[in-house]
């Protein structure tokens, strides 16, 4: 489907947390083993690049605090989803 483009909308909290996560995991060997289709890297690199260039918070001196606040808000929205079952 050449010429078709998809738009994905994220909240600023989602974008910040996803950007941080991608930055931490994309270059780890374990993650490379999970991505078993080289073509998927095209989308991952596009998403990561767009997040990095579109998030001014990354360069803010209070980045760590903003990231932690975003994580806290998103986890609160999730409720019990994704929690380990005892």
Please identify what each model-predicted range represents.
Residues 1-12, 16-86:
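Positively charged, low-complexity terminal tracts
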